[in-house]
Amino acid sequence: MNFFDVLEEMLVILFAIAAGYVANHLGYLGGETDQKLSKLILNITMPAMIVAAVITGEELPEISVILSILEVGVVFYVLEFALVLTVPKLLPGTAGERGVYRYTLAFPNVGFIGYPVAVALYGDGALFYAAILALPFNLLSYSLGPLMLAGAARFRWRQLLSPCIVASVLGLVLALTRLRPPAIVGEMLDFVGDITVPLSLLVVGSLLAHMSPGKVLRSPKLWVLSVLRLLVMPALLCLVLRGMHIEAMVLGIAVSQMGMPVAVNGTLLSMEYGGDTEVMAQVTFLTTLGAIITIPVLAAVLL
């Protein structure tokens, strides 16, 4: 694992957010454009990326390895949801803000940032492991995520049939059955899915364009959430998994994924379903900024 490889990945991501910020001030992004891009990502490019991540690997691991990764995923989310059920009650805020607190603790950025970080730490073979670990994230974030952010009153059962959830179920079935569609299918999905990450980061940057950085940096609540998200939660997961004697590579990938900043999807889902988009964008910015330091440190110290 290379400290500077991980640092470079984080700087690339921060640059994309900065580009979205500038694009908004130049009039290229903002308002209706951001909303349409959000719909494009959630309904077309993201589902393509989810399935492509599972079917484009060179070689599928044994089913026992896949089940082991999913077992780690269960521990991963049990730990997260234990904090989701307790921490937001201790922090002051509106119902919308508490929804953001819950989403922040529940859903790290295991895809957009997690995939390249896993590859930087463990090589190309780590991508499939990271993709399998991300499948529970995809299922939960697109079903429970809107419920957390917008509340039960705005939840609709048809949200469970969103393209991202359908793609996640399909990806899980393909992984467990070891079915592989023709290579051209993977190439097509990968080609479309590849625009997901830069587009999403541009939208986040655009949403931050009219936000006061000082307001974010002076918010104790956002700092508490950021420290929990970036440092405390990965440290706890590392202790638990080491006690379970999990394979070193799986443990390392899981701990690094737990230490990711909050998922960019939260901002997109807030826009789509009526959550507190401003606070969601603020905590996304702060955790992503902090992760430039904490992720390389996690790689060097915990793993």
List the model feature ranges, each with a label.
Residues 1-303:
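Alpha-helical transmembrane segments of multi-pass small-molecule/ion transporters
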